[in-house]
Amino acid sequence: MSFKMTQSQYTSLYGPTVGDSVRLGDTNLFARVEKDYATYGDEAAFGGGKSIRDGMAQNPNVTRDDKQVADLVITNALILDYDKIVKADIGVKNGYIMKIGKAGNPDIMDNVDIIIGATTDIISAEGKIVTAGGIDTHVHFVNPEQSQVALESGITTHIGGGTGASEGAKATTVTPGPWHLHRMLLAAESLPLNIGFTGKGQAVNHTALVEQIHAGAIGLKVHEDWGATPSALDHALQVADDYDVQIALHADTLNEAGFMEETMAAVKDRVLHMYHTEGAGGGHAPDLIKSAAYSNILPSSTNPTLPYTVNTIDEHLDMVMITHHLNASIPEDIAFADSRIRKETIAAEDVLQDIGVFSMVSSDSQAMGRVGEVITRTWQVAHRMKEQRGSLDGDSEYNDNNRIKRYIAKYTINPAITHGISDYVGSIDEGKLADIIMWEPAFFAVKPDVIVKGGLINPAINGDANGSIPTSEPLKYRKMYGQLGGNMQGTSMTFVSTTAYENDIGKLLGLKRKLRPVHNIRKLTKADMKNNSATPKIDVDPQTYEVFVDGEKITSEPATELPLTQRYFLF
């Protein structure tokens, strides 16, 4: 016998369904459900009097050996991803996403492709948003505490370089040489994130570069503080082509060895990841931003200039001076800092993100960027651009799906593609590591509710351990069992070069984490950047620094207030 209920009743039980819209935090953005995998009336839900009970939505006969039986089911989740905004159950097995579909007991329920059995645990996601774990590809490994801060913001993968609080690490995202790379690979065993390290890219002797790739580096960083010359860049790219790794470039702010055009001539048609492409974080002054028009350049922003606000310019000068070891008593050092901070190019950066010219967002952690704010600032930009520029083509009232898919790609799938790890992480897709972030919609992009890392909860908001219920105050992020014993190694990956993987670097160093090789990098173009592949003509006026896209001046007004800010940090 069928039972009818109102849409509001249904939503309160099982979350939104097709046609419903969900507001993201206190932004002006709304996600509309495009598809619901549920069979109405056969929804799987856990709790007293609910359907996931023996002989009902839980099958009493199956064992874990059945390939369709999940270790974990996340029920009735609203999935926001670069290619879908859907309501579904998520099945996890052996720490990987097994299936996105309909969970339950196929003996009595229709359309079940994820079986719940006696060996299955449940996380209830009714009314909650689920996203893939974020990927930050511009990390200065200056402080190991960054990992926990990032994890609690929804980031599950860090790529970059460093060795701790050395001047080189604080400035240049470089882990130089085999000895340092091996030490950092060992250190990664105790970090709760997926990790990949970049080596130093400055050497005309290819052996000095190749030995870093053999030691596990997943790419090389060419940075102006070590000398971002056309020669250094050319040699690094030659090695990258030989070993299928990525080159990350912090270009030559002072134009000492040439201008932007000379750098691009040295790059030729070879792919590289251009860091902080607007230029405030470093790079050819004043026109590095033009490089985003090239089809072989994969451009990213770092978060200190995102979004553009009334405070952005003032805070940046001190950041540049400290990060790059400059001396305030030397006029040339002051001029160096001043050359990087241009309100005209910063004002254009948000727009270039919004129209899909800039493809990624990263942090630049403790080196002019904030490791725990990649996700928050990405969505603040999306809000500001809708506020100033209106809806994107194809979006409408209470439906910002196109803009949502564009912006979520910037810190999930696109950085994964750029660094050759998209087979493993970067989206909510079958076969990928179960790095899954759950959000209460009101707290979206600020404070995740539950972080699932490699199939295990770690961490989660939880109450006083002596409380009679799990919500006894103080509610705060607490480490879970995913960070205890051997689970730190079992739920995270360390990414290494293919040559290091094939030569069993894990055995050499006694590593226990899952090692995975980076690959499919050197043939990438900007067309591979999901929802962010535009290559218009970009010009910069050398006198005024105004930015023009296809002949049209682009700019934005500095924000005086933003969503996802103070009201979320009173407790």
UniProtKB/Swiss-Prot annotation:
What are the protein's UniProt keywords? Cytoplasm, Hydrolase, Metal-binding, Nickel
N6-carboxylysine (modified residue): where? K221
Q: Name one Pfam family in it.
A: Urease_alpha
Q: Please, which domain of life does this record's source organism belong to?
A: Bacteria
UniProt similarity note = Belongs to the metallo-dependent hydrolases superfamily. Urease alpha subunit family.
The residues annotated as the active site are H324
* GO MF terms held by the record: nickel cation binding; urease activity
| Name used for this protein in its record | Urease subunit alpha
Please give the cofactor(s) recorded in the UniProt entry for this protein: Ni cation
- What is one cellular component GO term in this UniProt entry? cytoplasm
Source organism per entry reads Staphylococcus xylosus
In what pathway does it function?
Nitrogen metabolism; urea degradation; CO(2) and NH(3) from urea (urease route): step 1/1
Modified how: Carboxylation allows a single lysine to coordinate two nickel ions.
Picking any one GO biological process from the record gives: urea catabolic process
Q: Where, per UniProt, does this protein localize?
A: Cytoplasm
What reactions does this protein catalyze? Answer: urea + 2 H2O + H(+) = hydrogencarbonate + 2 NH4(+)
- Quaternary organization: Heterotrimer of UreA (gamma), UreB (beta) and UreC (alpha) subunits. Three heterotrimers associate to form the active enzyme.
Residues binding Ni(2+) 1 are H138, H140, K221, D364
Q: Where is the Urease domain?
A: 133-571
Q: Which residues bind Ni(2+) 2?
A: K221, H250, H276
UniProt xrefs under HAMAP family:
Urease_alpha
Report the cofactor remark: Binds 2 nickel ions per subunit.
Q: EC annotation?
A: 3.5.1.5
InterPro entries reported in the protein's UniProt record: Amidohydro-rel (IPR006680), Metal-dep_hydrolase_composite (IPR011059), Metal_Hydrolase (IPR032466), Urease_alpha_N_dom (IPR011612), Urease_alpha_subunit (IPR050112), Urease_AS (IPR017950), Urease_asu (IPR005848), Urease_asu_c (IPR017951)
The taxonomic lineage of its organism, from the top, reads: Bacteria, Bacillati, Bacillota, Bacilli, Bacillales
